[in-house]
Regions:
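Glycine- and acidic-residue-enriched helix-capping/strand-helix junction motifs
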Residues: 32-46
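A generic structural signal for short, well-ordered alpha-helical segments in conserved domains
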Residues: 45-49, 59
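Caspase-like (clan CD) cysteine peptidase catalytic core
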Residues: 2, 59, 68-93, 97-157
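Cofactor-binding loop segments of dinucleotide-utilizing enzymes, especially the Rossmann-like FAD-
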Residues: 28-30, 64, 145
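Boundary at the C-terminal end of the N-terminal hydrophobic targeting segment
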Residues: 16-20
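Short glycine-rich His-centered loop
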Residues: 21-36
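Short beta-strand elements in bilobed, periplasmic/extracellular small-molecule ligand-binding domains
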Residues: 53-63
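Sec-dependent N-terminal signal peptides
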Residues: 4-14
């Protein structure tokens, strides 16, 4: 189980200095997918949000984000707020899909009929990485607790011939 390691890492990462730091966490748990429900992501997200809160983080929590637009709005909220913080932490639990060398978080209600739909409807993890790396936060952490079994893949025709 990954949660104890996450918690230990979190504790070590946030105790960089004795002074009070402003801490912001974005916590997302997606479970109610249109292709079947995942058992743990929402509960894991709620536990993580509670842990962050107990450690003095301001927490942005969202669960079962249905569309790419809604997902982007939550990320945008985090991005706009994080400038005022010393520590930025993003935790995602839900479906994750890799296409080529890119990784994507998947909203719960998007229909991925073919592999290329991931580009249109998924959230590229690089967006989160860019947000974290361009900030002036002392500490930035991204944890993807993503289910990598791809329930959409059986529908995809991967014939790549011209």
């Amino acid at each position: 189980m990954i949660r104890p390691f996450i918690f230990l890492f979190l504790l070590s990462a946030i105790s960089l200095s004795a002074q009070e730091e402003k801490r912001l966490a974005l916590v997302i748990g997606n479970a109610n997918y249109n292709v079947g429900e995942l058992e743990n992501p929402v509960n894991d997200a709620l536990l993580m949000a509670k842990a962050f809160d107990s450690l003095g983080f301001d927490v942005i929590l969202d669960t079962n984000i249905q569309t790419k637009y809604e997902f982007v709005e939550v990320i945008k909220e985090f991005d706009l707020k994080r400038e005022d913080y010393d520590v930025g932490f993003v935790y995602y639990a839900g479906h994750g899909i890799q296409v080529g060398s890119e990784n994507y978080m998947i909203p719960t209600n998007e229909k991925l009929e073919k592999e290329d739909d991931v580009y249109y409807y998924g959230i590229n993890v690089q967006m989160i990485i860019r947000i974290l790396t361009r900030s002036s936060d002392q500490v930035n952490v991204l944890i993807l607790d993503a289910c990598r079994n791809n329930p959409f893949e059986q529908k995809w025709n991967r014939n790549r011939s011209f």
